[in-house]
Amino acid sequence: RTADAGNAKFTSGVDAIRTILVDGFANISNEVGSSKIGNPNTLAKDGKTAEAVLQVESWYSWNSITDYSDNIISIKNGYAGRIGAIGDAAHANSISAYVKSRNADLDARMTAAIDGAYNAIKSMQSPFRNNLTGTKVDAAIEACADLTELTEGELLGAFRDAGDYDFTSILTQYADQVVTPTYKDMKEKAWMLYKAMQALQADNKSQAKVDAACAAWRAMRVPWEQ
């Protein structure tokens, strides 16, 4: 919110926006495509199946595809300036709205790239740990790479000529309606998981309590990944 000359980390609004794009969006899509999906895929193709499975995030819970697609949702939320689902409209004070006002085609392609990465991941056969190779996995890796390339290239470039544009409203919307609610949700769901685990510890022979703890863990994963 206070990205200006008096801020030790972000000396301008556009500096903060660029950090969101590179350290946020691009790093996330690259990690999902090249590391979370790509590393196990490469090992599996090399015949190192056992090692490949251990490289899969959440392999023990079969929650990997949900985790990866939720990572892409986090990019969508940041770009749209609000927490929501794929296909939801962007807020008026958002990175998307700014880009659209300057280059509607780029905004449409960025939105399509986010949607494309999400849908490609969701199209992979589940559970990922048992289906580490194949055309759908390759498509997901490629879609994430396309999103990373577009973000680091044209999208980042769109802010090089921002001049003295005041990004305060966009950054405030991002902080208040994306970042803060996400951490609040994470805190609340982490507490619910803690309580569920306490109940399970007190009676670890109860299947209902095992199921409740599993459900609480999965619920807590959502804000963590998004």
Regions found by a protein language model. Give the residues of each.
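Mature extracytoplasmic or organellar-lumen-exposed domains after removal of signal/transit peptides
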Residues: 1-226
